[in-house]
Amino acid sequence: MGKYMEKLYEIKSNLVKYKNRVGLKNKEFTIISNNCWGGFVYQKFGLEYRTPFIGLFIFAPDYLRLLANLKEVIFSEVNFIAAKDSKYVEDILVNNELPKYPIGVLGDNIEIHFLHYKNEKEALEKWNKRVKRIDFTNMLIKLSDIDRCTEEIIREFDSLNYKNKLCFTAKE
């Protein structure tokens, strides 16, 4: 009975994704996000990931620096560091322990926290595969006011020269 229910759930899930996708006029967009939100959007519509920003997060100050020079920085080599060497070490401690997920550094010391990846090899393979799918002419740039986001960062984000920007904030 378990396999039957799993198959039924899979069929239902695919039908829901199809129904969601039917209303989309634009199905080949790139989401640049400072957290996992973009992955949820692609999953809801059953779309291929067209971004490397899946299963990871970037602290707001680094994210803003990345966006300021996206085309120049995004294709630079990802180098990995130990969690103890993160400039955000106080922020990532959980119960006084360092996280086990990989932390990559891109460009000029922009940290990428690969939260949902097992190891550096997996993180790098997924990043390199997905970064090639970015469509710079069809992007949605999203910021959430988490991970050291300030009102000043939100103002700077708003001033960036991107056509489609979205900011989720609880700040006034």
Kindly give the residue locations of the regions a language model identified.
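Positively charged, amphipathic N-terminal segments that serve as targeting/anchoring signals
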Residues: N14-K27, I32-E156, C167
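Short intrinsically disordered, low-complexity coil segments enriched in acidic
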Residues: M1-G2, E172
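A generic structural motif
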Residues: N164-E172
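Short hydrophobic helices that act as membrane-entry/anchoring signals
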Residues: G2-S13
